[in-house]
Amino acid sequence: MARMSLMIMMIMVAVTMINIAKSDPIAPCYFIFGDSLVDNGNNNQLQSLARANYFPYGIDFAAGPTGRFSNGLTTVDVIAQLLGFEDYITPYASARGQDILRGVNYASAAAGIRDETGRQLGGRIAFAGQVANHVNTVSQVVNILGDQNEASNYLSKCIYSIGLGSNDYLNNYFMPTFYSTGNQFSPESYADDLVARYTEQLRVLYTNGARKFALIGVGAIGCSPNELAQNSRDGRTCDERINSANRIFNSKLISIVDAFNQNTPDAKFTYINAYGIFQDIITNPARYGFRVTNAGCCGVGRNNGQITCLPGQAPCLNRNEYVFWDAFHPGEAANIVIGRRSFKREAASDAHPYDIQQLASL
């Protein structure tokens, strides 16, 4: 029954996407800032351990391995199709010409809000670097449209999705071997530092024409197979120390949304509760057709989480029954649920104050 319910849900999402794609998108463009949860190829040419351009990544994606840290779609792929785009948003590394008018994906695996986050993994493009790349894109949009006012009007209708912070915990604060932030900051003061840096970049985006912002909260990192493998005695109980810190950060994101909405009346900000949506999935897995919530479909060691999915490794066959694809990242089936609920909330707590569909219509 659970497998049947998941199949029905995926068919319904696919039909909805096809119907939407027949008309113009409800937003002219979609700009994406983030990390490996939404990277779709920007790290492929970097000297980095944080790359996913090899099999079995992309095993269920039509184009095969592209750099997505998933067996198939990411959440922003789902959202892009629900917005009405006929194709996925192009990564900055390969975006050229008129294609940028549809939007650009700047996300980079291992990236964080802090510049040093993820440095032990090699090359990555931190939030400030992603925003700098967008400023370059804006100048190209002005050239294409031929007028600054025309470009500003066009960009004001676009959706700007920002989902960073996970690596600032996973590959910084809770990694004392490489970073001192865990000793320098309390969870509260660290979240304050992240939010101050985050806010600075939002202001740069605003200055460069962004007016519709969707801030994606950090998920329950303490429930990932990697953290369960390292820190959970029974391999099932999430690491509350990490999840508690994530919730502190998320609560401050909500405060950012409220402050910007009050102080910048010509812009609209919303918070997407990825943490809450994900918690619902792992608390009620059968509702979504999942059977395994604590292990990766592809990985090595305890919970398939001690080493992430290796090149050429054979993944599980029942991928739609696993919440996680690898040691850190949800699989396509979970991404469809998260993307769908981000676009159109199913519970009041999924988004504050708007879901992405509502944001696009404002």
Curated annotation (Swiss-Prot):
Enzyme Commission identifier(s): 3.1.1.-
Active-site residues (renumbered): S36, D326, H329
Alphabetical UniProt keywords: Hydrolase, Lipid degradation, Lipid metabolism, Secreted, Signal
Gene Ontology cellular component annotations, sorted alphabetically: extracellular region
GO MF annotations, alphabetized: hydrolase activity, acting on ester bonds
One GO-annotated biological process of the protein: lipid catabolic process
Region forming the signal peptide: 1-23
Leading EC class: hydrolase
Chief location category: secreted
Keyword Translocase: no
Subcellular location: Secreted
PANTHER family on file: BNAANNG05710D PROTEIN, GDSL-LIKE LIPASE/ACYLHYDROLASE-RELATED
Family the entry assigns: Belongs to the 'GDSL' lipolytic enzyme family.
Name recorded for this polypeptide: GDSL esterase/lipase At5g45670
Source organism (scientific name): Arabidopsis thaliana (Mouse-ear cress)
Lineage of producing organism: Eukaryota, Viridiplantae, Streptophyta, Embryophyta, Tracheophyta
